[in-house]
């Protein structure tokens, strides 16, 4: 028996970002009987907007286990081993990129199940594209330390790497801590460091701007409290 295929399906980056989902993705979803995601409730809500006429009751929704033991994930891939295609969804953006879906993809390769990435919105790539910072050498750091001493120490390490290799660093913060994070950046980065703020990407209130720390000190920061955002620093 031939095995099914795992399709990696990008999701909207937020409410109002549905326009970024290409028609060919919707066609693939319509032909998929199994969907893996972090939370079935979120995925169902997204699909009701993207495909109002989709018969959700005919789709089997499988949720990623929180602690992700390999045995639990292998159970999710059982339909593919029996010849059925599976769509893997992220909560927002692309599966496997700063996303727990990477463990599903890892096991799919181990089980020799074909993996097909589909094109769609990735906040990391969109922010890097729009920042004007070095796209040849970059590192996504995820969440930086919350406590100020550890955060300042991490920034020093990043600044050293930037000076040596012109590396661009991308990172995120819990939305309600955005402003606190920006304050620390303002206080601890050299004036000539370039900082890009990319918030609400693909959404109606999208904001993207790259300025030096010195310029940000003069203009002040935008109001991105509780908004999903990426921060990029570079030369």
Tell what function each PLM region has.
Residues 1-64:
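Glycine-rich, flexible N-terminal cofactor/catalytic loop recognition
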Residues 3-7, 84-85, 163-235:
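A contiguous loop/helix-start segment that scaffolds small-molecule binding in enzyme catalytic cores
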Residues 13-14, 91-95, 175-176:
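Short glycine-rich anion-binding loops that position phosphate/pyrophosphate groups of nucleotides
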Residues 29-35, 112-116, 168-169:
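Short active-site oxyanion
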Residues 41-43, 93-94, 123, 177:
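Alpha-helix capping/helix-boundary segments
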Residues 62-69, 144-148:
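Conserved helicase motor
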Residues 65, 72-115:
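Glycine/small-residue-rich loop that forms an oxyanion/phosphate-binding "nest" at active or ligand-binding sites
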Residues 103-161:
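Class I SAM-dependent methyltransferase SAM-binding "motif I" and its flanking Rossmann-like core
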């Amino acid at each position: 028996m031939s095995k099914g295929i795992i399709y990696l399906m990008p999701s909207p980056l937020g409410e109002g970002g549905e326009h970024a989902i290409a028609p060919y993705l919707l066609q693939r979803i319509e032909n998929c009987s199994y969907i893996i995601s972090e939370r079935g409730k979120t995925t169902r809500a997204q699909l009701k907007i993207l495909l109002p006429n989709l018969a959700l009751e005919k789709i089997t929704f499988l949720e990623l286990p929180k602690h992700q033991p390999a045995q639990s994930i292998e159970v999710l891939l059982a339909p593919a081993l029996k010849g059925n295609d599976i769509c893997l969804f992220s909560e927002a953006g692309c599966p496997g990129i700063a996303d727990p879906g990477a463990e599903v993809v890892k096991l799919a390769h181990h089980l020799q199940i074909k993996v097909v990435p589909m094109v769609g919105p990735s906040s990391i790539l969109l922010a890097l594209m729009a920042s004007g910072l070095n796209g040849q050498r970059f590192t996504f750091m995820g969440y930086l330390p919350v406590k100020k001493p550890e955060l300042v120490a991490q920034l020093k390490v990043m600044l050293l790497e930037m000076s040596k290799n012109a590396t661009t660093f991308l990172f995120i913060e819990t939305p309600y801590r955005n402003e606190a994070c920006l304050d620390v950046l303002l206080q601890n980065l050299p004036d000539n460091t370039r900082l890009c703020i990319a918030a609400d990407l693909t959404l109606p209130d999208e904001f993207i701007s790259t300025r030096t720390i010195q310029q940000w000190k003069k203009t002040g920061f935008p109001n991105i409290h509780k908004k999903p955002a990426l921060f990029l620093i570079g030369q």
